[in-house]
């Protein structure tokens, strides 16, 4: 059974509970049963999407403007990750230009000046992850009962 996450996001779109991209609970103004329903709905989606409740997932409450600008949940989450990565660096820290080695015009390279012992063509930039890091969390970390909050 495939569950559409957008249905859950739309259903709880007007909730006053706000999360950041790391999944920390920033503000909870809704009543506890409503929040528990939201958390259970999100957990059901994660269980279905990821194949079990041991995996981590991302929950974002989108406002209507963000939702309408994004074609899908994946596009929206990628947009958030891109913004988060851009915000992590100041202009002084970030390199001015990143070279994509796959786009280098090899006809302009003078192969006689390359020290082949220092070049490993198969492990270019191996210390950087191949994909953008995903902001994830375990939803069970902040699902609380009223007794635990006191």
Curated annotation (Swiss-Prot):
Residues 101-125 are annotated as: 5 X 5 AA tandem repeats of [FH]-H-[EK]-[IV]-N. Sequence repeats lie at residues 101-105, 106-110, 111-115, 116-120, 121-125. The keyword Repeat applies. It comes from the Viruses. This is Uncharacterized protein D129L. Keywords: Repeat. Belongs to the asfivirus D129L family. The keyword Repeat applies.
